[in-house]
């Protein structure tokens, strides 16, 4: 039992060591972007999303930021919510709309691996992943359009001149401390709970159940092999899929189907890392709700794509 506790604390410390510094840096940079008016210079990107979803213009600032750094965007939304600028429903919809820019932002980390393992077909698969994120964004934009009141958008005539001085840095630093302390507190507690569940095999148990069910699907052994490898080692799954594709064992549609199924299976172990992130930024209740809504909707959309490949 003592070994489990030590392992839990070690795992927690490791996660916090790698996540908190970047989170604080992201928070500080987001405050600099806001206070210096830099974000207003590229606000036109987010304006498209806010006007189609009946969201306040402030949400457009966060959505614009999500194309640069999704973590900063989420911190901005929480900041707006705590200041009373946006309400709870607008917070949820704005956060869930971030699916497309967040997925697109992975191009620099995911696309090179896909190109190296799957060649040109890796680009096709990445486009499919981006399309899934885009559909998720469209769904929540539609929900915003239906559930939020229509609003009039006035032309923003405020001063958009970029200002970088000591006052901007001081205000950004002060806000970073103000909002950073509760985030660090929540992310630490969430990390301890998540690490405890990891050490006692909760996520492995759930993943194993789902993997066993996957064998009942009408797929080839090779497709299942790629899919069940992905939660364990996604690079290994890409390499395996590339080998099967090059040897003609699987065709392009079968590889897509296998990798999409693998991404569904990967959703459960991914919660180990998503839980501290969401809960740390949004708090326990809202963080858990947003994490589960986003995960479930993405799984449903991905499952729909898998079904389409079975029909083709």
UniProtKB/Swiss-Prot annotation:
According to Swiss-Prot or TrEMBL, what is its membrane topology?
Multi-pass membrane protein
Its principal location? Answer: membrane
InterPro entries hit by this protein: MJ0871-like (IPR038880)
Q: Does the keyword Repressor apply?
A: no
Task: Name the source's superkingdom.
Answer: Archaea
Signal peptide: which range, if any? none
The UniProt keyword set, sorted, is: Cell membrane, Membrane, Transmembrane, Transmembrane helix
GO cellular component terms listed in the entry, alphabetical order: plasma membrane
Where does the sequence pass through the membrane? Answer: 9-29, 115-135, 187-207, 224-244, 264-284, 292-312
Q: Where in the cell is it found?
A: Cell membrane
* Annotated protein name in UniProt: Uncharacterized protein MJ1556
């Amino acid at each position: 039992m003592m070994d489990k506790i030590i392992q839990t604390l070690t795992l927690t410390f490791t996660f916090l060591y790698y996540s908190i510094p970047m989170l604080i840096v992201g928070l500080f940079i987001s405050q600099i972007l806001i206070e210096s008016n830099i974000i207003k210079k590229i606000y036109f990107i987010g304006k498209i999303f806010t006007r189609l979803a009946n969201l306040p213009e402030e949400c457009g600032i966060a959505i614009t930021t999500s194309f640069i750094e999704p973590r900063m965007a989420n911190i901005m939304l929480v900041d707006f919510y705590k200041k009373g600028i946006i309400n709870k429903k607008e917070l949820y919809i704005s956060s869930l709309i971030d699916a497309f820019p967040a997925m697109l932002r992975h191009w620099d980390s995911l696309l090179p691996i896909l190109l190296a393992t799957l060649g040109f077909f890796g680009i096709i698969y990445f486009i499919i992943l981006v399309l899934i994120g885009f559909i998720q964004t469209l769904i929540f934009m539609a929900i915003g359009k239906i559930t939020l009141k229509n609003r009039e958008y006035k032309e923003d005539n405020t001063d958009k001149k970029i200002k970088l001085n000591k006052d901007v840095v001081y205000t950004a630093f002060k806000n970073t401390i103000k909002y950073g302390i509760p985030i660090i507190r929540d992310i630490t507690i969430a990390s301890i709970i998540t690490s405890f569940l990891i050490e006692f095999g909760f996520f492995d148990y759930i993943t194993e159940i789902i993997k066993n069910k996957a064998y009942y699907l009408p797929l080839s052994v090779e497709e299942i092999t790629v899919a069940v490898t992905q939660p364990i080692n996604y690079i290994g799954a890409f390499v395996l899929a590339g080998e099967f594709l090059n040897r003609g064992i699987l065709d392009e549609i079968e590889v897509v189907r296998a990798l999409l199924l693998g991404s569904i299976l990967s959703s459960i172990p991914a919660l180990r890392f998503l839980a501290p992130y969401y809960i740390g930024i949004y708090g326990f209740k809202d963080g858990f709700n947003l994490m589960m809504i986003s995960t479930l909707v993405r799984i449903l959309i991905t499952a729909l794509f898998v079904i389409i490949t079975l029909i083709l």
